[in-house]
Amino acid sequence: QFEPDDIIELAQGEEVTARLVKTFSDDNWKVFFSPLSEEDFADVPEKWSVLVQNLEQWSTELGQLWNKFGFIPQWQRDDIMVSYAPKGGSVGKHYDEYDVFLVQGYGHRRWQLGKWCDSSTEFKPNQPIRIFDDMGDLVIDEVMNPGDILYIPARMSHYGVAEDDCLTFSFGLRYPNLADIFDNVNKAFCHQDPELNLSEFQLPLRLTQSEQSTGKLADENIQAMKKQFLAKLAESEAFDALFKQAVAGTVSSRRYEMLVSDEMSDPDEVRSILEEEQGVLMQDNNCKLLYTENPLRIYANGEWLDEVNVIEAEVLKRLSDSEALDWAFLNNLVNDTEDPESTMELLLDSICNWLDDGWVLIE
């Protein structure tokens, strides 16, 4: 679908996240960030590379390739990145903090994988990107052809060099960090299940009194509060529910702002496509959609959807599991309700909202 000129043109878009890496020598690298322009590409050295993030935003078809990685839970997905480089182009020897699957889409690229890295790994000084020279003993040294896939674990050193004009697509994974979870715990306290009783967190802490200076907050008092704080978190069922909500909100959030169309979907048109044209409803993989159980809760792009009804929750749950839903399934689902026709009308309205928000698509 994509060719090199497509990526160069896409990288110059106003709302695109891209980087242009120019290699003037082994010790002279320059990086240019979005927004990129024609002038940036008019003055490139022999070796250079451009990387575009969040391709799901710009290609629905490419985003659906995530379904080929069904063994990866949706909450671990980050985004799809593409790297274009002419012969000799590279981003240097480096490592990443996340796992990645590389898919060669066009041309050929030579990949070398070497030693494991960590926070003590030394990088080349005075460079705008984290690169190094020493990869240790190579464990892989292969040329990837179109259609080949290479898995690179987090913190494994790697080095990719274009053999000719080539495009490599990176399906990146990620795990949450504690700072993001802490932030979402606070959000969960502000937006929690109204049936959840949080009164236990409003009780004053019990501290042993001791003689101390009037203005001093003693370290032993702070440590005593910390001990009670951690003990309460470990034993509280209410906090378990909040923590589940916080984690789900964290891992369902998108790293990049989601762009949506101004067009409004029409329920009658959606019904016609599904019922008469045998269309199927699918998740748009530009959206992060997932659920937790006990009880069933749906999350989309970092938000808990606390207002969806039982029918909508079932549809979104199945979509998040990569199911394609046809009219027969939707019809059977609403036929089990007291008022099937009204329920279907409400569901079609919701599907239109999901289409407008970029959560789902119809094929």
Per-range role (PLM):
Residues 1-148, 156-209:
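Active-site region of the double-stranded beta-helix
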Residues 154-157, 283-285:
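Glycine-rich, charged/polar anion/phosphate-binding loops
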Residues 304-363:
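Long, charge-rich, low-complexity alpha-helical segments
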Residues 188-249:
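Long, charge-rich alpha-helical interaction segments
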Residues 234-320, 352, 363:
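Acidic, low-complexity/disordered tracts enriched in E/D and polar residues
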Residues 67, 105-106, 187, 227, ...:
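A broad, structural surface signal
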